[in-house]
């Protein structure tokens, strides 16, 4: 019994010594990690892809196959930006770009169409009533040269006036009387060449030929021999072919970039080898309400008549603006209600800022205001940072500051 009691006593003594030793070692152990955990109070957990949904405990995201991320109390700050773990930004491929100042270049092609030049347009009319003796073999679409005969007419009023003129000449009429009759013929529409012929030959002309007043293409001509024709009836319509018009619809938002003809390059698929010369251009004043475009009209040389009305063409606009603030277009966050970027300050914090966009072209966006030359903006990996800014309240602070400046 004594032996058993001795063994039990030894075991109790050993347990007491072990417990005391464990307590001493536990007290001597550095409390760094415990202290660190205690200092970093967790407010909630969240999925970076759905930052507005918060969870009260860790685990897997119900939206994505990824662990929830803790939001620590010491990350809440009154500063305007947010700080993100560098490992996270590196893994997500966050990249930055510098705000620069320079011209915004613009190069875009627009479909265009060849049409008649409305300034090269002539209407041939009968200046007095008569009847048609002869119609020359012409029809719509035929090309004519200036002075080409269109039809022969007999006009009784002109014949009568010529008879009066010759009678006065024979009976000794005064110069005033004869000149009055000639002026009456001019007002009645008798061609000046026929009047000169009357004076020179002293013979009555009974048949008169109407001729093409310009080079061009007949677009209206529907008369036959033997038809009566009334005063001011349209005999023919002729459209000139040199120069022609080429028109294209361009967005109203880039109209301010159009300055001179050197910015345009014009090509026609039907004649890809042809070099086209633009005489002049004009932006028509009206804006199409449906497409928000303006009509750009070019006057193009067409001496060889290679360009035909109705042909398709391509107009390429190459231009550049005055120097302005530029950022990569992928750095812009456009929600529809506001436009913002994420900048990087001197301390490495990500700060959201509102910007006013002027124009975008070829992956570059020009700004009216909001940034300064030399600032850094995030151009890749925006989603994580913008989500973090939303969670931390940085976006609300940005909007509050913008509202304060506005007032």
Swiss-Prot record:
A UniProt-annotated Pfam family: HMBD
Positions of disulphide bridges: none
Membrane-crossing residue ranges in chain numbering: none
Keywords: Copper, Copper transport, Ion transport, Signal, Transport
Signal peptide: 1-28
Induction summary: Transcriptionally regulated by CusR in response to copper and silver ions.
Keyword Signal: yes
Alphabetized GO MF terms: transition metal ion binding; transmembrane transporter activity
One GO-annotated biological process of the protein: response to toxic substance
GO cellular component: membrane; outer membrane-bounded periplasmic space
Subunit structure: The cus efflux system is composed of CusA, CusB, CusC and CusF.
Functional summary from the UniProt entry: Part of a cation efflux system that mediates resistance to copper and silver.
UniProt record similarity statement: Belongs to the membrane fusion protein (MFP) (TC 8.A.1) family.
Protein name: Cation efflux system protein CusB
Native source species: Escherichia coli O157:H7
């Amino acid at each position: 019994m004594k032996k058993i009691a001795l063994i039990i006593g030894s075991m109790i003594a050993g347990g007491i010594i072990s417990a005391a030793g464990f307590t001493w070692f536990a007290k001597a152990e550095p409390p760094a990690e415990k202290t660190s955990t205690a200092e970093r109070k967790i407010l909630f957990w969240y999925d970076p892809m759905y930052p507005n949904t918060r969870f009260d405990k860790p685990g897997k995201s119900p939206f994505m196959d990824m662990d929830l991320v803790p939001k620590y109390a010491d990350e809440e700050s009154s500063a305007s930006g947010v700080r993100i773990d560098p490992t996270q930004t590196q893994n997500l491929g966050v990249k930055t770009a510098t705000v620069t100042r320079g011209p915004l270049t613009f190069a875009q092609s627009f479909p265009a169409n060849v049409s008649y030049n409305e300034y090269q347009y002539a209407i041939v009319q009968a200046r007095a009533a008569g009847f048609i003796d002869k119609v020359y073999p012409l029809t719509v679409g035929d090309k004519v040269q200036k002075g080409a005969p269109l039809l022969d007419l007999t006009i009784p009023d002109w014949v009568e006036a010529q008879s009066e003129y010759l009678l006065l000449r024979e009976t000794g009429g005064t110069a005033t009387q004869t000149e009055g009759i000639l002026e009456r013929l001019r007002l009645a529409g008798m061609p000046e060449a026929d009047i000169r012929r009357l004076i020179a030959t002293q013979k009555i002309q009974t048949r008169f030929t109407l001729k093409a007043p310009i080079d061009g293409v007949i677009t209206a001509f529907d008369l036959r021999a033997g038809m009566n024709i009334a005063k001011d009836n349209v005999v023919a319509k002729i459209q000139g072919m040199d120069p022609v018009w080429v028109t294209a619809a361009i967005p109203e938002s880039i109209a301010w970039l159009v300055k001179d003809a050197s910015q345009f390059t014009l090509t026609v698929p039907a004649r890809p080898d042809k070099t086209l010369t633009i005489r002049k251009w004009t932006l028509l004043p009206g804006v199409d309400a449906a497409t928000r475009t303006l009509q750009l009209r070019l006057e193009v040389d067409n001496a060889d008549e290679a360009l035909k009305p109705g042909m398709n063409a391509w107009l390429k606009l190459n231009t550049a603006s005055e120097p302005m603030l530029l950022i990569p277009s992928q750095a812009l966050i456009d929600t529809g209600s506001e436009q913002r970027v994420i900048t990087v300050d001197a301390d490495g914090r990500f700060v959201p800022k509102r910007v006013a966009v002027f124009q975008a072209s070829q992956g570059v966006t020009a700004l009216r205001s909001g940034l300064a030359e030399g600032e850094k903006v995030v151009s890749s990996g925006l989603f994580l940072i913008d989500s973090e800014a939303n969670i931390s309240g940085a976006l609300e602070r940005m909007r509050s500051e913008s509202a304060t400046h506005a007032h």
